[in-house]
Amino acid sequence: MTTLTAQQIACVYAWLAQLFSRELDDEQLTQIASAQMAEWFSLMKSEPPLTAAVNELENRIAALTVRDDARLELAADFCGLFLMTDKQAALPYASAYKQDEQEIKRLLVEAGMVTSGNFNEPADHLAIYLELLSHLHFSLGEGSVPARRIDSLRQKTLTALWEWLPEFAARCRQYDSFGFYAALSQLLLVLVECDHQNR
């Protein structure tokens, strides 16, 4: 990626982690349709590989603003996709895709991080991967840890995530009939792919 800074990429990962970790509340729903968010989306679209995915997400957000009982419907979508059985869902856990759920724990230890007791999900939840990537991108800008070490850990994290993220995103597209989380997962997929190629 050439246009976005490490800190901006960190913010995108943190934002996506938040959206995939819990249902949106009224404040978040208002925020994603705000002028401030539109500016942020414009910035993301300055990165050509992200343009189509951001456009689709903006379309879903526009549809969301006219959806009856938007918050409740989106909460139902979240629950159906991420909290139910895996038959018609996109469970946000590495272990649901036959991946090593211990890998993220090793990566967190290597980064000197632990999961929060406030987040009542297994450590292999998608949001944990995204928080780790956010932390690593922020660390790149701080200069307190050698960049090579951070970059090595970033690449390991991206590789571990990429092993199951495409299937997760495909399941989001398949089972999210409204399309908000499908669009969100597509944006994440493109972001991770670009980040992974930016060695």
Curated annotation (Swiss-Prot):
Primary localization class, coarse: cytoplasm
One of the record's GO cellular component terms: cytoplasm
Keywords: Chaperone, Cytoplasm
Gene Ontology BP annotations: protein complex oligomerization; protein folding
Compartments where found: Cytoplasm
InterPro entries noted in UniProt: Chaperone_TorD, DMSO/NO3_reduct_chaperone, HscB_C_sf, TorD-like_sf, TorD/DmsD_chaperones
Function: Involved in the biogenesis of TorA. Acts on TorA before the insertion of the molybdenum cofactor and, as a result, probably favors a conformation of the apoenzyme that is competent for acquiring the cofactor.
Family, as annotated: Belongs to the TorD/DmsD family. TorD subfamily.
Record-given protein name: Chaperone protein TorD
Native species: Escherichia coli O7:K1 (strain IAI39 / ExPEC)
